[in-house]
């Protein structure tokens, strides 16, 4: 009953709790249990029911939203995402609201990441008798695939917030490989990990003065124009038109595929308004592009 309550509370917090149900079934299968045994299925019915309700709610909220508009299937990014968030778990540096992602898919790095993804599958299979390793690995994988690929929207699929819950799976899997005789080592390393993430979180909060500050910080180590567009919108809403125009003109010159069509409509309408008095011809062109 306690696990059901915790699962329910987790679903209210984040859709990323939903893969927990699939992980439960996969654990039974990989550990050699009969997945569709009556007792096994009955024990999971409450989780399945709760997950179904929250899935319907999530789909209802997303049905009117524009999906990822890249010229490739977002599933091709899965190996890159798995490696990216894994790297951020162990090296939480240059954290951002949203990150650049590969624009050239079939590169050497893309091939290497796919090979690494296959190797990860072998590693999971090899440790299938380790329940904590299985749970952590599968929870991490299911979260990333569900939340950043299957339901990619708006700022997906590379953003810090998608890793908040997911990387717990990585640490559970990693710590499960430490022998039971090394409990002291586990406590020391675990304490250091918690301390590091506490310090990183504290450092990040220094940039949280307002949303404009967050996007400005993002521009210090991200090269795409997406952040300019998001910051420009905030400038425009605050009436800081000169700053907004500079950001919007940057994204006009270097368009970003993460922007949905309606965002470009907003951008060109704003540029049209801001250039009405200074350049009527250009303003008319902007309004025309907005439509």
Description of each model-found segment:
Residues 276-281:
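Alpha-helical linker/edge segments of TPR/alpha-solenoid repeat scaffolds
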């Amino acid at each position: 009953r306690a696990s059901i309550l915790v699962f329910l509370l987790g679903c209210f917090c984040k859709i990323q709790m939903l893969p927990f149900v699939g992980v439960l079934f996969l654990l039974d299968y990989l550990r050699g249990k009969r997945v569709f045994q009556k007792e096994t299925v009955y024990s999971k019915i409450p989780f399945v029911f709760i997950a179904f309700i929250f899935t319907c709610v999530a789909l209802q909220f997303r049905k009117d939203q524009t999906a990822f508009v890249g010229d490739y299937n977002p599933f091709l990014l899965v190996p890159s995402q798995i490696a990216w968030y894994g790297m951020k778990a162990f090296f939480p540096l240059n954290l951002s609201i949203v990150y650049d992602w590969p624009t050239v898919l079939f590169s050497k790095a893309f091939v290497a990441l796919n090979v690494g993804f296959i190797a990860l599958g072998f590693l999971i299979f090899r440790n299938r008798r380790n329940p904590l390793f299985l749970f952590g690995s599968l929870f991490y994988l299911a979260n990333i695939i569900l939340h950043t690929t299957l339901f990619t929207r708006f700022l997906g699929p590379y953003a810090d917030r998608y890793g908040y819950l997911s990387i717990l799976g990585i640490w559970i899997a990693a710590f499960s490989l430490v022998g039971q005789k090394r409990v002291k080592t586990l406590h020391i390393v675990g304490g250091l990990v918690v301390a590091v993430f506490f310090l990183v979180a504290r450092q990040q909060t220094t940039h949280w003065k307002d949303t404009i500050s967050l996007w400005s910080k993002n521009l210090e180590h991200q090269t795409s124009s997406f952040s300019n567009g998001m910051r420009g919108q905030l400038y425009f809403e605050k009436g800081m038109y000169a700053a907004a125009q500079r950001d919007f003109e940057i994204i006009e010159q270097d368009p970003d595929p993460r922007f949905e069509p309606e965002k470009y409509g907003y951008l060109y309408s704003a540029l049209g308004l801001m250039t009405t008095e200074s350049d009527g011809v250009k303003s008319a062109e902007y309004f025309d592009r907005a439509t």
